[in-house]
Amino acid sequence: MSDEGGYRIRRRSKHALPTLRSYRDFRLLWTGSAMSVMAERCSGMAFTLLVLWDTGSESAAGLVGFAGLLPALLVQLPAGVMVDRLNRRRVMMTCVIVRMVAVATVAVSLLGDTVWVWHIATVAFIQSSMTVFYQLSERAMVRGVVPPRQLGAAMATNEARSRGVNFIGHPVSGAMFGLSAWMPFMSSVGLYLLSLITLVRLRGEKEPPPRPGNKRRNMRADIAVGLRWVWDRAFFRTALLIIAGSNLVFQGLILTVAVVVREDGGAAGTIGLIMASGGMGGLFGALVGGWLNKRLAMRQIMIMAHVTWALVMPAAVFFRQPVALGVLFFITSHIGAAVTVSGMSYQVRITPNNMQGRVGSVVMLLVSGASSLGALGTGYLLEAVGTRHTLMVVSGVMVVLALVATAVFTRPGAALEDRQDSAPPPQPEPVAIADGSTADPLTTLELRRIDG
């Protein structure tokens, strides 16, 4: 260990990169976000269980699910602008505080043995809105706490964290709900508090991201810039639209499986275990996502993922046993996590730093916004035609998406569009040193960010 310019650095070989654990700010960002995600997962799943078990109404459960996913449609674009204008660390801290207070109101109402669907839906909306701001800020900050060559590894580590939390959070939430309805919400409050304490220690950015020319722009103009940036990249926008369709399908599958378990007399904990199986599959998928991203082009990953989903999803129509559903969720989540790692790395790598929030918000609007429509539509579809026919519908939609992905990404010109869109933004010029020589900005960043 040595000290240069006030920064503690580890001695390493000429070509070796330090591990991600060597970066203090990345460790704190990862840990604080892990607790925040765990809190959101515990309360998010408990919202649906609470309404479904208390009212017995699939449409009410779908309404709460819609409220929790609606911010993906309404909040994404304004949030992207604000993330590019404000200090991202402070945005994250504010989001944690607001979510903590909102979820605490549910815990208090349950301690008083009171449940209102409108209250649960409102808190679900507030929590999800703050989660949008938080996720955009966190993803943008990753680029500032690790060097460019380790961005893919950092994204894979973050996705593995989220999938691992899904694996743990869903069964824990289901088990706590089985013991007492207020327990998942009170646990979320405690986790949010721990997340806040961790984020306070994060150095973060001293100022908001620089804006070219320092020109003041209105929000509508800033949103238009982000939309135009995505729309001008043919391959990028096509991939996003197809993934948006698959997200709509998966949201419908999740709600349908919950109803299947309840119809068959299963407990809330059974749903948690099925979701945990998906979390385990996602964890393994995230771990191999970086490896896959280095060996396959994005268009090849898209075809592989959608064809596999189309082949395995119809199994839910014929096999209702919890073990079979758990295996299905393991496979679909494994592939989904690998696609997510590749997609996030792709987007962050090609997007300029001062546009990370806006471009990320457009991506999340297209990819996750469709999920809100999936939750709402599936709730009413279930009441109209039942679980079996609903599963047939969502499976059929996935088959269509697989055919579209195969046709679009194997056509002449698809490879050229992929290469054009994936060209990274200009890299910074070498840093001038007093003796007249220059330094590689990557090396400079590594030395500045490492704290043993």
Model-based region annotation:
Residues 47, 133-146, 338-351:
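Intracellular juxtamembrane helix-capping segments at the cytosolic ends
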Residues 3-27, 205-241, 424-430:
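Juxtamembrane intracellular "pre-TM" segments in multi-pass secondary transporters
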Residues 48-55, 106-112, 168-187, 259-264, ...:
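Transmembrane alpha-helix termini and helix-breaking/packing motifs in multi-pass membrane transporters
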Residues 117-128, 150-210, 269-272, 276-280, ...:
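Hydrophobic alpha-helical transmembrane segments
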Residues 34, 115-133, 244, 324-338:
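Hydrophobic core of transmembrane alpha-helices in multi-pass small-molecule transporters
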Residues 34, 66-70, 97, 156-164, ...:
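Transmembrane alpha-helical cores of Major Facilitator Superfamily
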Residues 11-71, 228-278:
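Helix-loop boundary and gating motifs at the non-cytosolic
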Residues 74, 78, 85, 89-91, ...:
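C-terminal transmembrane bundle of multi-pass solute transporters/carriers
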